[in-house]
Swiss-Prot record:
Organism: Debaryomyces hansenii (strain ATCC 36239 / CBS 767 / BCRC 21394 / JCM 1990 / NBRC 0083 / IGC 2968) (Yeast)
InterPro entries listed in its UniProt record: GINS_A, GINS_bundle-like_dom_sf, GINS_Sld5, SLD5_C, Sld5_GINS_A
Entry function: The GINS complex plays an essential role in the initiation of DNA replication. Has a role in chromosome segregation.
Gene symbol of the encoding locus: SLD5
GO cellular component assignments: CMG complex; GINS complex; nuclear replication fork
Keywords carried by this UniProt record: Chromosome partition, DNA replication, Nucleus
Compartment list: Nucleus
UniProt GO BP: chromosome segregation; DNA-templated DNA replication; double-strand break repair via break-induced replication
Name of this chain's protein: DNA replication complex GINS protein SLD5
Subunit description: Component of the GINS complex which is a heterotetramer of SLD5, PSF1, PSF2 and PSF3.
Repeat in keyword set: no
Domain of life: Eukaryota
Pfam families: Sld5 (PF05916), SLD5_C (PF16922)
């Protein structure tokens, strides 16, 4: 094997090899497409000032892939242990298991990074997202948050409210204890700054026209890199025409 190959080359070579067919009954397939989609989702989430719609279908596919790979590894290790003295377990077989373990680790890392980024925003703007998702069905594939994120958000808010009440709110007049007070021209609710500038790359072939102000439009073309207000291109990120970089 060429020592200059990186892990992606090795994984691709592995996916194209005959040995891969042994794992077909576990539903293990080429994970490069899943990996690329997960990288894009993770980068978009990390670079955006607010929470993007949860990738329901992608995450379901990723978690299924991880479960299948882990089951395959478990069964393969049991097979290897029971045949260790027979000579059946070859170097190629061991390499196959090492490659799958590497694939599991990199997918796990991206999933954790994606979810931690989302939870950090939920922690920071809890009341805002409670209001934003008040009419959402978390089981719907188009909902902003996953069911687990929604549950986490409400538990986090409950704990936070109890902490504030026990620490200092119970000693204050009632009209000063509202965490979501918007009266007096000053909102107590922290919200993401959707007008901050972000770096973007256009990946759709169809040019996108965005309105900068009353007299000026900006044409975004394929493979072009721009710095624009997040609010102007958020919808294009959600439909996949633009990615954040």
């Amino acid at each position: 094997m060429n020592k200059d190959l990186d892990i992606d080359d090795i994984l691709q070579e592995f996916d194209d090899s005959n040995v891969h067919s042994k794992s077909s009954k576990y539903g293990i397939r080429n994970s490069e497409n899943i990996y690329d989609q997960l990288v894009a989702a993770m980068l978009n989430e990390r670079m955006s000032p607010d929470v993007l719609p949860y990738k329901h279908e992608l995450m379901k596919e990723v978690l299924t892939q991880l479960s299948n790979q882990q089951q395959y590894l478990l069964d393969s290790h049991e097979y290897g242990d029971s045949n260790v003295e027979s000579g059946i377990v070859t170097g190629d077989f061991k390499l196959q298991l090492m490659i799958i373990e590497t694939d599991i680790e990199r997918l796990n890392y991206l999933v954790r990074l994606y979810l931690r980024t989302r939870l950090a925003k939920i922690d920071k703007f809890t009341i805002h997202y409670i209001n934003e998702t008040s009419n959402d069905d978390p089981t719907n594939d188009r909902s902003l948050l996953s069911p687990e994120e929604t549950e986490y958000m409400h538990k986090h808010f409950k704990i936070l409210t109890q902490l504030y009440n026990n620490s200092f709110l119970k000693k204050m007049p009632h009209f000063l204890t509202l965490l979501d007070d918007t009266s007096g021209g000053q909102s107590m609710i922290s919200v993401p700054d959707i007008n901050q500038p972000v770096f973007i790359k256009v990946i759709t072939k169809v040019p996108i026209i965005i309105n900068l102000d009353e007299d000026e439009d900006l044409e975004l073309v394929e493979n072009g890199i721009y710095v624009v207000k997040y609010s102007l291109i958020k919808k294009y990120i959600e439909i996949g025409d633009i990615v954040l970089i």
